[in-house]
Swiss-Prot record:
Protein name from the UniProt record: Uncharacterized cysteine-rich protein YhjQ
Entry superkingdom: Bacteria
Gene3D superfamilies: 1.20.1270.360
Organism: Bacillus subtilis (strain 168)
InterPro entries hit by this protein: DUF326, YHJQ-like
Cysteines paired by S-S bonds: none
Length: 108
């Protein structure tokens, strides 16, 4: 496996962890209605990151397309999470944008 795919795999795993943590923390908030977009995108993002990791590890013929979609979803999740002041949302946004950048490189 090439070096750049290892970096992308690491970014996807980090993003998946950050999204899962953010998802859990958002559900613990007393007022969740303003976090519904964040919660929904955390799930989507964690799922596509897991799929992207699997695609890279198995050298899927659809790896580039999956990584491109992963980048799009990570950007959407990062943008949504970045709207919220919670530390977990800000950390998630950062991980999402890092993952999006790595996945864009893989998809190129």
């Amino acid at each position: 496996m090439e070096q750049y795919s290892e970096a992308c795999i690491e970014a996807c795993i980090d993003c998946m962890k950050a999204c899962n943590h953010c998802f859990t923390k958002c559900l613990e908030e007393s007022v969740q209605h303003h976090l519904s977009g964040c919660i929904r995108l955390d799930r989507e993002c964690a799922d596509i990151c897991a799929l992207a990791v699997k695609a890279m590890q198995t050298d899927s013929p659809f790896m580039k397309e999956i990584c491109a979609l992963c980048a799009d979803i990570c950007e959407a999740c990062g943008t949504e999470c970045g709207k919220h002041d919670h530390d977990h949302c800000q950390a998630c946004a950062k991980a999402c944008f890092t993952c999006a950048e790595q996945c864009r490189s893989m998809a190129a």
